[in-house]
Amino acid sequence: FPKIKDIDFIINRRGELDLTANKKYISNTETSYTLLRGRNVTLYDIRKEVISEYVKPEFLEITNKRQFVEKDRIICQQISNINCEKRLKFALCPSNHILGNSCNFIAIEDNKYGLDIHALLGILNSNLLNWYFKLISSNNHINNYELDELPIPLFSSNLHKISDCVQKYLLHKSPETLLNIDYLVNEAYGIKNTDSRNKKITNSMDNDLSYIIPSIRTNT
């Protein structure tokens, strides 16, 4: 499976506003641009109740990431405790939100594979990729170079199903739909032997996982 770093229509970057160096652009007065920090990001959601900061429009004149501010993108925390069971927590970020550098973002362009922003969101939030990330990450940061190493099932026929399921989950937040997303993602990677109840990778998946990531065994 190709990794994010090898896919030219997926852009993986750090949040555009340096919370220290660009502090003068942060305002408590409402503007057209909401500031999001890492603490605002949860699994599939943005904690709107803790949003109280905005960004002055002048900031857009100095950032080289303006084009990403003006479109929907996927975001995650830049710091996540290494001991957390679920380290990868991605959410859909609407346009006109500016990200502090305590966030990472992933943008996606139109492509011939049928991979849209919702399908990619479901893949990134899967328990499988969370498991994989925990194998390759050795600190509390969610680094862009680590996200670059995540494999994406570009050629799967499940991409449209994953997208539909994610959109359904965003509307209704059904636990059953969340499990269905994980099932479809696992299937997209050619994996069918999972324990959905415990959301864990089982030993019987050893051969499948070796196919996806040959250099890593399940006993790592």
Give the predicted meaning of each segment:
Residues F1-K161:
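Polybasic, glycine- and aromatic-enriched phosphate-binding surface used to engage nucleic acids
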Residues F1-L19, T31-V41, L154-T220:
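Non-catalytic DNA-recognition/assembly elements of restriction-modification systems
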